[in-house]
Amino acid sequence: MWFKNLTVYRFNKPFSVDTEALEKSLEDFTFSPCSSQDISKFGFSNALGKQGQTLVHSASERHLICATKEEKILPSQVIKEALEDKVAQIEAEEDRKLAKKEKDAMKEEIVMTLLPRAFTRRSQIRALIIPEIEMILVDSSSAAKSEELLALLRKALGSLPIIPLSFKTPIETQLTEWLKGNSTPAPFIMQDEAELKTDSDEGGIVRFKQQDLTEDEVLAHIEVGKQVHKLALYFGQSIAFLLQSDAGIKRLKFSEEFRAGNDEVGTEDPMARLDADFALMGSELIALMNSLVEVLGGVEDSI
């Protein structure tokens, strides 16, 4: 339930699909396990996992969705060795060298033979659609995995007018100014971790962890042209996270004190607790994103 990373997108046009329509749209793209000849399968699953019964979980017009991916595990070395053995056998029997086209066809046959016996692994990825702030927050640090989920959502809805979150002023410019001035705008508080680098490909990268970022050693790197591309921050007393210059948020962690706000709900009714946690998390993520947009100078205008 509690998101651990954020890859953020914003809508170009208002999102006006209600819960019922969204649920119906996702139904045609629900997850099903791999058959014997499938390499992978990807589809929407219950938003709240085993406790849930719907593909969309909504509260206060915030929509949680989840997609499941199942992949067959076929080690490349196993395929390579099987192919080499098969090629060697045929070339010896026929006294000729096989063409690349023949080898490629042989490789496909080997893969299809191995698929029914292959182990599988599953992974899930969730996203929170928040029309209130015109954003989609994907619980992933991978842009590729986020795009895979959003491509499936776009296919289900017919269209999905979104772009990656970006700001009018480069994030690294703002973070560098904060570090130079040893000051972050409220309610953000600087932690003890940062990554600095130059804009040129030849420039170096320096990382600081568990270190006072106001020390001369850190500031000296800024003086010679490096900029802050990653900075660990606190959002008040509720969230710790690592902000990146590409607007990605990693290592998102809600404090124990904040999560304890739902302790009175108890755990006797799992669905009630999940509902409460979803509401608590959603409200705080909205507050976080609104505050980030404000202190980072506003989002970049849509093209």
Curated annotation (Swiss-Prot):
GO terms for biological process: DNA recombination; regulation of DNA recombination. It comes from the Bacteria. GO terms for molecular function: double-stranded DNA binding. It is found in: Cytoplasm, Nucleoid. Keywords: Cytoplasm, DNA recombination. InterPro entries: RdgC. Transmembrane segments: none annotated. Belongs to the RdgC family. PANTHER family: RECOMBINATION-ASSOCIATED PROTEIN RDGC (PTHR38103:SF1). May be involved in recombination. NCBIfam families: PRK00321.1-3, PRK00321.1-5. This is Recombination-associated protein RdgC. It comes from Shewanella sediminis (strain HAW-EB3). The lineage of its organism: Bacteria, Pseudomonadati, Pseudomonadota, Gammaproteobacteria, Alteromonadales. The gene is rdgC.
